[in-house]
């Protein structure tokens, strides 16, 4: 995908985060283009998930700023950032295991449409219509992810790879502009990883999404991403197209040499 005609959606500017005396993220700067698939790789403990937590407002930066659609989101709370169109998945699955796949996605629709929480209690006609739309859109998302026939099954009974797909479907129910995926291929077999890669491309096109993903499976990242940033000990050591990153001596020494 050509990036020459795209505009930056997210700008990370000198982002820094200390935990006590530990410098977890060290003056990291990069821009992510609209509808780009952007990879974030590096050794364990490099600061990747911390960076996601900073972008989504789960923790505040010690220094630096975050610009999303030309507006600062640096001091916003997580729910405010979500309202602006940023959604994420987590390294550790956070599904509601006792609820069905459909219910998991519908809950996210409720969060997206806060009016439903209020008017639904009152039984207003508008609320009934909104709820019907919530279920319709949830079923559409499950269909996209190949889970429609199991919509009524409890999430805890899904295989791990299917739970990963369900979590992404739930994130999409928030109708984000920017989707952050934290190790989406973890625990998947090679066939499932290939399906996931194809699926990410599909939802990028279908929903005009921008995607940032953390992933340890290097072939998936290299084959999927438009550009890749590499972190090591909290520092950005490389940024560029996959082939450039693959051949970067600093990246080979810090990370790819272990593959």
PLM regions and their residue ranges:
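Glycine-rich phosphate-binding loops of nucleotide-dependent enzymes
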Residues: 2-259
């Amino acid at each position: 995908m050509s990036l020459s005609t795209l505009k930056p959606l997210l700008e990370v500017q000198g982002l820094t985060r200390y935990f006590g005396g530990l410098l977890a993220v060290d003056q990291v700067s990069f821009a992510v283009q609209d509808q780009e698939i952007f990879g974030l790789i590096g050794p364990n403990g490099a600061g990747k998930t911390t960076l996601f937590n900073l972008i989504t407002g789960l923790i505040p930066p010690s220094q630096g700023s975050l610009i999303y659609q030309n507006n600062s989101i640096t001091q916003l709370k997580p729910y405010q950032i979500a309202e602006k169109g940023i959604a994420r998945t987590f390294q550790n699955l956070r599904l509601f295991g006792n609820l069905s796949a459909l219910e998991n996605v519908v809950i996210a629709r409720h969060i997206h449409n806060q009016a439903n929480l209020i008017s639904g209690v009152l039984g207003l006609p508008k609320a009934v219509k909104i709820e019907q739309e919530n279920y319709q859109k949830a079923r559409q998302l499950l269909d996209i992810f190949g889970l429609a026939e199991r919509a009524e099954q409890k999430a805890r009974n899904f295989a791990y790879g299917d739970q990963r797909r369900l979590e992404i479907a739930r994130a999409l129910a928030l109708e984000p502009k920017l989707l952050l995926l934290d190790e989406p291929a973890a625990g998947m077999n090679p066939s499932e990883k290939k399906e996931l890669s194809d699926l990410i491309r599909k939802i990028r096109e279908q929903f005009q999404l921008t995607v940032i993903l953390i992933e340890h499976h290097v072939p998936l990242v290299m084959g999927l991403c438009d550009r890749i940033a590499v972190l090591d000990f909290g520092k950005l050591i490389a940024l560029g197209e996959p082939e450039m990153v693959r051949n970067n001596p600093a990246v080979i020494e810090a990370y790819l040499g272990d593959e």
